[in-house]
Amino acid sequence: MSEIRLIRAINDELYLVEVQATLERKADSLHIGDLKIIKEKNSEKKKATLTVGNQYMEGVVESLKKPLAVLQKTNADPVDVYSSPSHELKCCSIIRERIRFSSRPLPTK
């Protein structure tokens, strides 16, 4: 089962995260794990590590062929009494890269 999530990095850029597993978290917390994105020296490639509990996964950062827009739907007030309520879509961000974790989790060192 493949699970896809959106995360916000330190530089406020959104990434699409693709994991070939199910991630669990405590019911009272939104925190799942720690994600680190590392740019390789002498290269434009980026790698990522995700630590969840006592396991970690290694992944790669890839550019998306087509960027994705993150939209927020809001209810707009009707213009007059006779018009029906309408909805507005606001573009919050553009996702240009994804982080793909395709291997099984490994125990932390």
Swiss-Prot record:
What subcellular locations does the record give?
A: Nucleus
Q: Mind telling me which InterPro entries this protein's record contains?
A: Ctf8 (IPR018607)
GO CC field? chromatin; Ctf18 RFC-like complex
Q: List the molecular function annotations (GO) for this entry.
A: ATP hydrolysis activity; DNA binding
Task: Name the UniProt key words of this record, in alphabetical order.
Answer: Cell cycle, DNA replication, DNA-binding, Nucleus
- A Pfam family of this chain: Ctf8
Per the record, the GO terms for biological process are: DNA replication; mitotic sister chromatid cohesion
Annotated function? Essential for the fidelity of chromosome transmission. Required for the DNA replication block checkpoint. Replication factor C (RFC) complex has an essential but redundant activity in sister chromatid cohesion establishment. An RFC-like complex (ctf18-RFC) is formed where ctf18 replaces rfc1 in the RFC complex along with the association of dcc1 and ctf8. This complex is required for efficient establishment of chromosome cohesion during S-phase. Acts as a PCNA loader, loading PCNA onto primed templates.
**Could you give the subunit structure recorded for this chain?**
Component of the ctf18-RFC complex which consists of ctf18, ctf8, dcc1, rfc2, rfc3, rfc4 and rfc5.
* Family as reported in the entry's similarity comment: Belongs to the CTF8 family.
- What's the protein here called? Chromosome transmission fidelity protein 8
Origin organism is Schizosaccharomyces pombe (strain 972 / ATCC 24843) (Fission yeast)
